Amino acid sequence: MEASNKLAVLLLWLVMAAATAVHPSYSENSPQDYLTPQNSARAAVGVGPVTWSTKLQQFAEKYAAQRAGDCRLQHSGGPYGENIFWGSAGFDWKAVDAVRSWVDEKQWYNYATNSCAAGKVCGHYTQVVWRATTSIGCARVVCRDNRGVFIICNYEPRGNIAGMKPY
């Protein structure tokens, strides 16, 4: 193959690779990106779906904005159930990453004893699948000074009530 043909093939390959690359978009943090995986986890244990609440979204946005300065993994202390997530700088963490981390805690939850495995956390998972919860609202903020990403979801009614099973 001539050098000019090799160059043309290489350029065509580069153009096609660039055209098919996945580019992040705002749609990767839409309400549906929070709802779909949480509702899938709920359906897996026979619990009905949750719906999006703009009231909870606004609460989450306000608190996420407060965390943008330090990106500390600290709960709001608000009146709703709450799951929070922090992802380190250098990766464009999305809604699906936060929800996956919460749902992955299922492996540590023992329904029979209504407890987490020793030394493990599973309260984020139990909040996701809490039967009484009917609505959620979430927010995501990129923290200042390259400190990572903070993601929060609020739940109403709140879950994780002591002594009660989630479903």
UniProtKB/Swiss-Prot annotation:
The keyword Signal applies. SUPFAM superfamilies: PR-1-like. SMART domains: SCP. Residues 37-155 form the SCP domain. Keywords: Disulfide bond, Pathogenesis-related protein, Plant defense, Signal. Gene3D superfamilies: CAP. InterPro entries: Allrgn_V5/Tpx1_CS, CAP_dom, CAP_sf, CRISP-related, V5_allergen-like. Induction: By fungal infection in germinating seeds. Disulfide bonds join 71-143, 116-122, 138-153. Residues 1-27 form the signal peptide. One of its GO terms (cellular component) is extracellular space. One of its GO terms (biological process) is sexual reproduction. Belongs to the CRISP family. PANTHER family: CYSTEINE-RICH SECRETORY PROTEIN-RELATED (PTHR10334). Probably involved in the defense reaction of plants against pathogens. This is Pathogenesis-related protein PRMS.
